[in-house]
């Protein structure tokens, strides 16, 4: 009988997987290539053969994150075909799982905070990724019939970022535990606004004689009386 065991991961895959785990635990700047290579069961020479530098390895790790997120979007579409509102609610549920995870935050968000230099090779990739995710969420909101789609996309994005920080500072039982309830309430509020609210209609009154203010009328009457007395 043939051995159906899965083939062991290749050196490149082991390096990326190990690096992602170590970056999440210790921070990108808190771990060196020697430790990554050792824990990946390889050596520094092999690491540099696959990745020209540690910065290149960081970008490769972030590309893996982006691929996982792309698979997440594909999953929404497969689970709820032609139902953008259901996909939007699926995004909220997935966001809750992400925010309430192991407390180490999102790899992409952590890298954005740690790699603040504008000239870092990973910085441009992070910004493009974040912008693309925001645009994609906004498109989904528009497909769901939300009038202020861009505003809802930003509201949900900020809610997710805040939930991740809350998970790290207040724990899993903190405000992040109510992410789904809050996210769905926000969607419902925007969805109800999308139906259109009737604006109050004001009747235009027919033009008539201008009303004289009461004080002005009194002054006028007094002036008239004074003139009569002077005659």
Regions from the PLM with identified roles:
Residues 1-10, 191-231:
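N-terminal intrinsically disordered/low-complexity leader segments
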Residues 8, 16, 62, 66, ...:
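Amphipathic, non-transmembrane alpha-helical scaffold segments
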Residues 14, 18-56, 60:
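Helix-turn-helix
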Residues 58-65, 72:
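Alpha-helical DNA-contacting segments of helix-turn-helix folds
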Residues 60, 74-104, 143, 153-156, ...:
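Hydrophobic alpha-helical connector segments
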Residues 69-70, 86-89, 118-143, 154, ...:
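Amphipathic alpha-helical packing segments from all-alpha helical-bundle domains
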Residues 86-87, 99-124:
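Amphipathic alpha-helical segments used for helix-helix packing
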Residues 98, 157-175, 186-195:
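Amphipathic C-terminal alpha-helical segment
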């Amino acid at each position: 009988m043939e051995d159906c065991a899965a083939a062991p991961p290749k050196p490149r895959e082991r390096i990326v997987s190990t690096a992602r785990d170590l970056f999440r635990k210790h921070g990108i700047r808190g771990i060196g290539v020697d430790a990554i290579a050792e824990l990946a069961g390889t050596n520094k020479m092999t690491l540099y053969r696959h990745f020209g530098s540690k910065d290149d390895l960081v970008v490769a790790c972030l590309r893996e994150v982006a691929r996982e997120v792309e698979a997440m979007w594909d999953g929404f579409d497969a689970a709820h075909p032609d139902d953008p509102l259901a996909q939007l609610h699926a995004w909220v549920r997935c966001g809750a799982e992400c925010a309430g995870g192991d407390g180490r935050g999102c790899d992409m968000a952590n890298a954005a905070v740690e790699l603040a230099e504008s000239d870092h090779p990973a910085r441009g990739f992070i910004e493009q990724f974040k912008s693309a995710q925001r645009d994609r969420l906004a498109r989904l909101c528009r497909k769901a019939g939300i009038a202020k789609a861009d505003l809802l996309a930003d509201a949900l994005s900020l809610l997710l970022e805040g939930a991740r920080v809350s998970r790290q500072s207040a724990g899993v039982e903190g405000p992040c535990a109510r992410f789904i309830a809050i996210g769905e309430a926000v969607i419902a509020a925007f969805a109800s606004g999308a139906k259109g609210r009737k604006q109050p209609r004001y009747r235009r009154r027919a033009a008539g004689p201008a009303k004289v203010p009461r004080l002005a009328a009194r002054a006028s009457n007094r002036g008239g009386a004074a003139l009569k007395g002077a005659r």
